[in-house]
Every structure is written in structure tokens, then in C-alpha cells.
């Protein structure tokens, strides 16, 4: 009975919160009605998935919540547990106090951030492209995007959480709220290491004079604020700071873990020097980031919001495409940003389609334990999308105009 009441309240809250978000967007009545229908469809898609348990839930999330339940809830934060950073563990500790099956609590959290992701994606699209259809298009597509739907409602993962915060950070930067932007970015990073794929974009925002260097100092401050409760509860600082290093050091026996990275092009069973290839991949990702930063530096006086968004998409696709040891969900930012980017022009639609198909291949492999298609196909799709976005940025920069080059302020 308690579970049924909780689910009814969850669905009602999802619809009410979504309606409030749409009201805040100030859409035309017809567009508002269409988005409301999408909201209902998004909930209908997710509802049957909420009872599904994946191996990640059974092997990690459920035991972690049970550990908190048996060891004093928040007091157990001080104990070494799992490979997630402490901000997400706060939620799991809170769930341990509630008389509801933790599976539904975990997925309820993901549903809330699915909605926030659609909201922030809509805001970003409206900020970059303007017009009356950018917001509803991004909002609707993101709510119904297969990898977004599956990530939270079926898989029970929280990638929409850090992605929503990252998009919020980018939107605030473009909206001339630099301090708030960096704070959101620091919070996003505290939840998920994969935020690092987009962090170089804030260097572009700095030399494009969208923020000042002193604003970047808020990044470690906001990160520290998220871990402060754990420190006060007695968790050693070293344990907290080592979480991401441990994540980066795991699974070195495989160059890709169902991710459509370039390493998926290596035939199964082929004898290769994995250490050498990993170093080459890391070097290539580093060169991509440095090359992009230098390229945009020469155009810094004429960079528009669209240029910055396009650069963000290049990072979201290119960095995990080149890095070794990537997992199936590590292209989540690419999934989301490609949709927002494509809202600006219908001819860009093939890019998010390619990204989504490639990313979905990794989901299919994990969730159904079989491949929908060879992961090498996904790698080719991601590579094609990356090349097209880079070419698009180059053509856009060549057509742009600007005045002089002025160094950014400190």
C-alpha cells in the first residue's frame, strides 16, 4: 500500500513539476499543450520500467542502501563504501530512513533530474538560438530521448543529474552569470567525474571574456561545499579525493567497456599492446582539447553562443571517443548536447541521430547482454559525427566577423 501511494505521489509530482516548468517557459498555448502531451508520454514510457532491476542495482546500489540502513544512515558516510563520490551517497543514506523500496527511491531521483535536464536543455537552446520553438523542441526531445529514458527509469543511473547541472552551468555562463555558472559546474563535478569532458570549455569562456579568472576559483569552493558534510561526519579527506582516481584506475584490462570509442574498432581477440594504445588514446584526447582551445583562442573576439555550444559538443563527443577505458554511459553528455545543438537547424538532425544510435548500442549490450550491432559501427558513427561538428565549427568561424584580439581580464 505504501509503495502504491508513493508511486501515485511520484507520478503526480512529476506532472505538476513539469507543468510548472512549462508555465515558467511562457510558451504559446498550442506549444504548451503539445509539451504537456510530451510530458505525459514521457511518464507513460518510464512507469513500466521502474520495477526493473539491473545488475548495477543488485550488486551495488541496493547493498549500499542496505549498508546505510544497518549502520546508522548518515553516520555510515564515514565508512569506505563504493566508488561514487559522497554527494550521491547523501541521497542513498537519506533513502535508508524511508519505508519505501529503495529501487523506486533511486529511480524517483533520476526522474526528477530527467525533468531538470529537459528544462535546462530547453533553456540552453532558447539562449543560443532564440525563437519560440527552440525551448519546446529541446525539452520534448530530451524527455523522450531513448538513452535518457533508459538511463534513469530502466537502469537506475543518475547521469541526468550531472548532465542537468552541467547544462545549467553553461546556460548561466552564456546568460552572464559567471559566478553561478562555475558553482554549478563544481557541483556537477562533485557528482560525476565525466563532467571533466566539458570543463575545458570554461577556459574558452574565460578568454572569450564571458567570465573572469577569479570566477574559476569558485570551482574548488563549490566542490568543497559538497563534501563538507561528509568531512563533518568523520570521513577522511583522502578517501573522498581518491574516489575519482580509483574510478580512473579500474578496468584497465579492457580498452573499452561497451563504449563506442575508437578502441571498439579493434577486432575482438586481436593481440595488441593495450598499454601503448591507451597512452596514444590519452595523448590524442589531450591534443584534441589543446588544439580546440588554441583554435578558438584566435577567434576569441568573435565567438558567439553557437560557437561555444559547438565547441562543447566537440569535447563531449571527442574526448570519450579517444580516451581508453570508457564505459557504455560515458557519451551521455554527447547525447544531450547533440540534441540541443541540432535544434538550431534541421539539417543538423543527422548528428544527434548518429550519436544516439552509437550510444544506444552500448546500452543495449549491457541491459540485454547482447549486441544490437558491432560496437565498431558505433565508433564509426561517433567519429563521423565528430568530424561533421568540427567542420561545422570551422565553416561558422570562417563566415564570422570580429574586431581585434583583446586579452581576457583577470
Where are these regions (language model features)?
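Aromatic/glycine/proline-enriched transmembrane-helix motif characteristic
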Residues: 14, 20-25, 127, 248-322
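Specific aromatic-rich, kink-prone transmembrane helix
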Residues: 119-123, 161-178, 337-338
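Loop-to-helix entry region of an early transmembrane alpha helix in multi-pass inner-membrane enzymes
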Residues: 3-4, 86, 90, 100-119, ...
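Extracytoplasmic catalytic/substrate-binding loops of multi-pass membrane glycan-assembly enzymes
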Residues: 50-64, 79-91, 252-262
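Membrane-embedded helix bundles of polyisoprenyl
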Residues: 42, 134-171, 182-194, 219, ...
Amino acid at each position: 500500500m505504501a509503495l502504491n501511494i508513493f508511486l501515485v505521489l511520484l507520478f503526480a509530482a512529476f506532472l505538476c513539476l513539469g507543468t510548472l516548468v512549462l508555465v515558467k517557459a511562457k510558451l504559446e498555448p498550442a506549444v504548451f499543450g503539445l509539451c504537456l502531451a510530451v510530458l505525459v508520454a514521457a511518464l507513460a514510457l518510464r512507469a513500466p520500467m521502474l520495477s526493473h532491476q539491473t545488475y548495477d542495482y543488485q550488486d551495488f546500489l541496493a547493498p549500499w542502501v542496505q549498508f546505510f540502513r544497518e549502520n546508522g544512515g548518515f553516520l555510515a558516510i564515514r565508512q569506505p563504501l563504493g566508488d561514487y563520490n559522497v554527494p550521491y551517497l547523501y541521497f542513498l543514506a537519506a533513502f535508508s530512513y524511508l519505508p519505501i523500496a529503495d529501487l523506486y527511491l533511486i529511480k524517483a531521483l533520476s526522474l526528477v533530474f530527467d525533468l531538470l535536464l529537459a528544462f535546462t536543455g530547453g533553456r540552453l537552446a532558447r539562449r543560443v538560438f532564440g525563437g519560440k520553438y527552440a525551448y519546446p523542441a529541446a525539452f520534448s526531445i530530451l524527455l523522450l530521448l531513448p538513452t535518457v529514458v533508459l538511463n534513469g527509469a530502466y537502469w537506475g543511473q543518475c547521469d541526468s543529474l550531472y548532465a542537468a547541472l552541467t547544462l545549467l552551468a553553461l546556460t548561466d555562463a552564456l546568460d552572464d552569470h559567471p559566478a553561478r555558472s562555475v558553482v554549478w559546474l563544481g557541483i556537477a563535478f562533485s557528482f560525476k567525474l565525466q563532467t571533466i569532458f566539458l570543463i575545458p570549455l570554461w577556459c574558452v569562456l574565460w578568454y572569450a571574456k564571458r567570465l573572469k579568472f577569479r570566477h574559476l576559483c569558485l570551482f574548488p569552493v563549490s566542490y568543497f561545499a559538497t563534501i563538507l558534510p561528509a568531512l563533518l561526519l568523520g570521513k577522511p579527506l583522502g578517501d573522498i579525493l581518491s574516489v575519482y582516481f580509483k574510478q580512473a584506475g579500474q578496468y584497465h584490462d579492457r580498452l573499452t567497456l561497451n563504449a563506442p570509442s575508437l578502441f571498439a574498432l579493434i577486432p575482438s581477440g586481436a593481440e595488441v599492446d593495450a598499454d601503448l594504445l591507451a597512452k596514444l588514446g590519452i595523448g590524442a584526447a589531450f591534443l584534441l582539447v589543446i588544439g580546440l582551445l588554441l583554435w578558438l583562442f584566435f577567434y576569441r573576439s568573435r565567438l558567439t553562443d553557437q560557437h561555444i555550444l559547438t565547441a562543447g559538443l566537440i569535447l563531449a563527443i571527442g574526448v570519450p571517443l579517444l580516451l581508453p577505458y570508457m564505459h557504455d554511459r560515458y557519451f551521455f553528455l554527447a547525447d544531450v548536447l547533440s540534441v540541443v545543438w541540432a535544434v538550431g537547424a534541421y539539417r543538423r538532425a543527422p548528428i544527434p541521430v548518429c550519436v544516439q544510435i552509437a550510444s544506444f548500442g552500448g546500452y543495449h549490450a549491457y541491459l540485454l547482454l547482447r549486441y544490437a550491432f558491432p560496437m565498431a559501427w558505433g565508433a564509426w558513427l561517433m567519429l563521423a559525427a565528430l568530424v561533421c561538428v568540427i567542420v561545422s565549427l570551422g565553416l561558422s568561424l570562417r563566415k564570422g566577423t570580429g574586431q581585434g584580439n583583446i586579452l581576457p581580464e583577470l
